Amino acid sequence: MMPERFKLVVIPQTRGQFQAVKSLIERKDVAEIIIATDAGRDGELVARWILAKAGNKKPLKRLWISSVTDKAIRDGFAHLKNAKEYENLYHAATARAESDWLVGINATRALTCKYNAQLSCGRVQTPTLAMIAAREEEIRHFRPKPYYGLQLTGKGITFTWKDKKSGSSATFSKEKNEEIYKNLSGKTAVVAEVKKTKKTSQAEGLYDLTDLSRDANQRFGFSAKQTLNIMQSLYEHHKVLTYPRTDSRYLTTDVAETLRERVEAIAVGPYRSFTNTVLKGKITPKKSFVNNQKVSDHHAIIPTEQPVILAQLSVDERKIFDLVVRRFLAVLYPPYEYEQTKITLECEGETFFAEGNVPLNRGYKEVTAPDGDESGKVFPALKEGEVIRDFSLKKTEGKTKPPARFTEGTLLKAMENPVKYMQQKDAKAAKTLQETGGLGTVATRADIIDKL
């Protein structure tokens, strides 16, 4: 079924609402129309279809905001956009809606007829289901393989054997493992290298919806749909978090100018000590989270300038709010600093290594892991060339494991970057998927997973 032209039809249940809007559009004292639907592709489509069905010819303006606080709404109305700036967004939404219809109705009919069963097919749901099915096949046909390793313990340190050619700490050859063990027994080892390096680790980037959904699934077992619903409440009802359906992990420079007000708004309860630390100094926007070029429709999910009252949030809302707030504060904190020590041993031509980190400055981990045990691994002092005579050897072994089944969190990640799951190599299709952000959008993935 390939219609020459798609017709818009008003849903019977909402006909009264449509007529009310249509009558307002047609009023003679209304000179222009302001589109104030959800600031996104689907919100644009809803408004444009209503206007098209109503036969509107009046000039259009667009209210485009990322939070629904009173301040944000007033600022939005003070800086209305020309609706022509969003024409391409409307056309993209139309193309998606029509392609969904064409693929859905034709492929579903074909599958149902061929297999004599009620089977549905969708532009996004079917490739997603294919990834799940392929992973299940991989698990079903997986055969574990045993592997072997060696550990050397001396001077209070446990070292792990490393193959000089492959760099792997295990071998699939039991005979090789036995041979190395016999050759090293009763021998001496020499400290080949002691390398100490000061390193830093930056906080993870701000949340987009996919990243937030993955964390919420991993930590709390929330489904993607559940996380989106909670986020919608925090955005629309409580007005304490910004627009949820975003695919960006960056802020624009104009939003970065409001960081202090946003930090002040969350200076309550468990966050007060962290916000006090941030507010004591100058808040400097960093390139790691401020980049105009990496924000399309909406910036990353962050707190709004509206002060939060934690007692008004439900238990689940508190959990999601806590994730966002701690990630937000973490990027404003200094990096985590530590000293990494790498020790390499040589014994009869074989190499063993040990590695440990000692924290120097916890930095952002004060926020993200306040109760974290990071005392570090402090090694006894060893010098290069030092001989270790009294050491013990231990053979280790294990079996390879099949790939894990998808969780909602890992499935979201796969939908975001499905190229590596493609069974047929297609450079053009791979490039398109990378440019468009994968299967579905941050706004639709939760529904697709829920449907499957």
Task: Give the ranges of each region predicted by the language model.
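Toprim catalytic domain recognition across nucleic-acid enzymes
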Residues: 1-420, 424-428, 433-450
